[in-house]
From Swiss-Prot:
Stated family: Belongs to the pseudouridine synthase RluA family.
SUPFAM superfamilies noted in UniProt: Pseudouridine synthase (SSF55120)
PROSITE patterns associated with the record: PSI_RLU
UniProt source species: Vibrio parahaemolyticus serotype O3:K6 (strain RIMD 2210633)
GO molecular function, one term: RNA binding
Protein name, per record: Dual-specificity RNA pseudouridine synthase RluA
Pfam families linked to this entry: PseudoU_synth_2
């Protein structure tokens, strides 16, 4: 399933929300690739834009092109290695916000559905109980909405426990509440409701690659401005980077 047209937003060119000698955090807009695609016309990306000013910048995790929000990048090889290892051992925690179709009745819950690539229709993913990889998402209703025409939507707070490709999008579809604006997984009426995928990476906790102390970074959500820092209300990690020898292998 090829990308038909790529016109990423350019204003602002980059939106840096935090920087020190080791890491850089940026608010990626919806519609911009995290890293360059295979074709020359898909070179423009969050990484390539930052590389213009930071030649040694390294990507340690990615967001889908259609997803907006927080990306943390490494400014040197040592920081890159340290952060990638944290993602590998699942020491990082994330909070996303999404506007989904319909009213979600449960106030909160857990979606535990294994996912696998839908190869004939890649990059789509699908639920597969036989061969899928374990995938778990916690969700919580933040706000139920009703538009003037009677259309019902819900703002949900999403806490991915695993980090599979398209996990949040497929899990919300499986729950019967696809994310609005999702060209891959939404119903037609949910897809045309918004010009963009309303999925935003709002908060990330990690251990600083130099000090090894726990910290978090937050970026506001454009479609849910009420969002606020709360990652440590849901997760209670150790305050100092644990010894990897004491952790189970990923």
């Amino acid at each position: 399933m090829a990308m038909l047209e790529y016109n990423p937003p350019t204003d602002p060119w980059t939106d840096i929300v935090f920087e020190d000698d080791h890491i850089l955090a940026v608010n990626k807009p919806s519609g911009l690739l995290s890293v360059p695609g295979r074709l020359a016309e898909h070179h423009d990306s969050m990484w390539s834009r930052l590389q213009e000013e930071y030649p040694d910048i390294q990507v340690v995790h990615r967001l889908d092109m259609s997803t907006s929000g927080l990306m943390v990048l490494a400014k040197n090889k040592r920081a890159e290695s340290a952060l990638k290892k944290q993602f590998q051992f699942r020491l990082t925690h994330k909070i996303y916000y999404a506007r989904v179709w319909g009213h979600v009745e449960q106030e909160e819950g857990e979606i535990d559905l294994p996912l696998i690539c839908d190869w004939p229709n890649r990059p789509l993913q699908k639920v597969c109980f036989e061969d899928g990889k374990p995938s778990k998402t916690l969700f919580q209703v933040a706000k139920r909405e009703e538009q003037e025409d009677g259309t019902k939507t819900t703002i949900v707070r999403l806490l991915p426990i695993t980090g599979r490709s398209h996990q949040l999008r497929v899990h919300m579809q499986a729950l019967g509440h696809p994310i609005v604006g999702d060209e891959f997984y939404a119903t037609e009426e949910a897809k045309v409701f918004s010009e963009r995928l309303e999925l935003h990476a709002s908060e990330l906790s990690f251990y600083h690659p130099k000090s090894h102390w726990l910290r978090s970074i937050f970026v506001p959500c454009d479609f849910y401005p009420e969002a606020e820092e709360m990652i440590f209300d849901y997760f209670d990690p150790e305050r100092k980077l644990p010894d990897y020898k004491t952790l189970p292998r990923p």
